[in-house]
């Protein structure tokens, strides 16, 4: 089997349809569609490939999961820039539509907050925050920087937070 954890539906669909034809000599394919990011999208097509999509509000998140379900995704993948509210909306909508959830630990959350709500925690990036002796202080600092970010690339914001708090 092959699991694709981030790509735009319009680019994935032709390949997946070909691989899923009855006479295809191909592995089973499970796909999530785009990375579900927050107001700021890391993989926005600027300096990195466009494989993410914005979910700035709970309403956008709910609608996106319904659209992805109708597009035939096998699961969803939540990325790093979502707020706790959007994260909850995405996981609740996925549960409603019986879609498994893969996720990175969002920068706005800790592993202990996000982990219980997902089926697969990817790469364990950001898990170190929960392991630090000053976890609460580091988390508050991260939230302050996230909440004060007004515009710019999600990639830049994410990278600056990782650099700032690299352990």
Feature locations, PLM:
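Divalent-metal coordination cores built from histidine and acidic residues
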Residues: 1-167
